[in-house]
Amino acid sequence: MKKPLNKLEIKNLTFKNKNDDYIILKNLNLDINSDKVLFLLGSSGQGKSSLLKTILKQTDVIEGTILFNKQDIFQLNKKEWKSFLKEVSFLNQTTTSIPFETVFTNIVRSLQDYKNLFYNIFNLVSKSQKEEITSVLKELNILDKIYHRVDSLSGGQQQRVEIAKLMMQKPKIIIADEPTNFLDPNISKNIIELIIKMAKKFNSILIIVTHNVNLIHEFDSSILLIKNQEYHFYKSNKEINSNILDQVFKND
């Protein structure tokens, strides 16, 4: 039986930074489903990262709301909010791993069970968790690096470690903020393929922020373009052409 889609609904959203009165984006209406990746595009300073922060309640919302599977995230109590955050995972442009520790140890540290005192002191995982870590690394083609220090890996391999950590968490929402910013084109495409594959596996909503306009033509996706407090949504990347992109990134 097919799983129901996870869904993020943004309704009439207007928001600003907490430290000033500048309105970043006005009247945003958008549905994001787990059956299709959303690429978020815009030049620097247009509010892409601020929109992601709004999902985490880190900006001031003037109007509107965000629903996750029909539940208003701005109305969640403390316990419900904590539970929601466990469903959200981030992939950044730089590694969050501890460079002088091994791939395995970094993945163990990322497990939610690591907050348990037993894991914290003894750095141990269950047999099933170890088997899962091994399986994930094999799927990402870095099993041979399991006991290597993270700082001995290439940039692409380090991003695969970050993806492995996300796979262990099985998130319902994945936010990838410029995940291939420092990687060459071929590796960038491969990393995005892995992220999309992971999102499909876990039925996750996937939002990818990128400046790389070449990537959006490589994958079946929807596109949100942001510029000058306004947005344009395209249900398919096939609707995007070079003239549209030139306008978005003009003067960037």
From Swiss-Prot:
Q: What's in the keyword line of the UniProt record?
A: ATP-binding, Nucleotide-binding, Transport
Q: Return one GO MF term.
A: ATP hydrolysis activity
Identify the residues that the record assigns to the ABC transporter domain, covering every copy.
8-252
Q: Does the keyword Nucleotide-binding apply?
A: yes
So where does ATP get bound? G42, S43, S44, G45, Q46, G47, K48, S49
Q: Domain of life here?
A: Bacteria
Q: Name one Pfam family in it.
A: ABC_tran
Q: Which residues cross the membrane?
A: none
Q: Which PANTHER family does the entry link to?
A: METAL TRANSPORT SYSTEM ATP-BINDING PROTEIN TM_0124-RELATED
Q: What does this protein do?
A: Part of a high-affinity transport system.
Protein family membership: Belongs to the ABC transporter superfamily.
This one is known as Probable ABC transporter ATP-binding protein p29
Taxonomy, top ranks, is: Bacteria, Bacillati, Mycoplasmatota, Mycoplasmoidales, Metamycoplasmataceae
